[in-house]
């Protein structure tokens, strides 16, 4: 998320050829199906925790770049940004002191949703045998092992599935709550 955030801030603030290059790179990443990309990388590299973290990070940064870019495009023409430019504040300081703090609430909410998505990606890749490998523990591995015993030991697959569902639901609810708490429109209502 950090790489995507930096790329999005630079792209949105400076515009021009930087924006074009960053957005074409994100378009290229979006054109590749996430699961297919992850499967290719995980079959080329040694499947394990570090490889899985790398794959999830590489597949998530374009989303952050687009989200942050759209926020920056909305902020860069605000009066306080224009005033900062007028008094000679450098672009770096404007990005760090004015833009970054104002996109932080959106970034936090999107990060919680990204965590939920990452859990689902990890579980699905581990279920397919491309993620975390036994004897390491993963809900996806537990689901994969339990599917062979559904008729006799149904709980082996049911409880990991419920755990995944409840965890993702809890994280999504946390993201919605954070959105409501951090939304500037709701500040006067509390």
Task: Name the predicted role of every residue range.
Residues 1-190:
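Alpha-helical transmembrane segments of integral membrane proteins
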């Amino acid at each position: 998320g950090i790489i995507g955030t930096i790329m999005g801030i630079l792209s949105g603030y400076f515009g021009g050829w930087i924006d074009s290059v960053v957005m074409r790179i994100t378009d290229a990443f979006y054109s590749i199906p996430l699961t297919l990309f992850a499967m290719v990388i995980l079959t080329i590299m040694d499947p394990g925790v570090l490889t899985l973290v790398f794959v999830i990070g590489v597949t998530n940064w374009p989303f952050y770049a687009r989200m942050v870019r759209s926020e920056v495009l909305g902020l860069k023409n605000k009066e306080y940004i224009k005033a900062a430019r007028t008094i000679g504040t450098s672009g770096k300081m404007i990005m760090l002191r004015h833009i970054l703090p104002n996109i932080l609430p959106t970034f936090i909410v999107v990060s919680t949703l990204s965590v939920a998505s990452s859990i689902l990606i990890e579980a699905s890749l581990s279920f397919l045998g491309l993620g975390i490998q036994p004897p390491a523990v993963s809900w996806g591995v537990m689901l994969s092992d339990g599917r062979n015993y559904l008729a006799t030991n149904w709980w082996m697959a049911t409880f990991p599935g419920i755990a995944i569902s409840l965890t993702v639901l809890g994280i999504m609810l946390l993201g919605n709550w954070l959105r409501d708490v951090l939304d500037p429109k709701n500040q006067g209502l509390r």
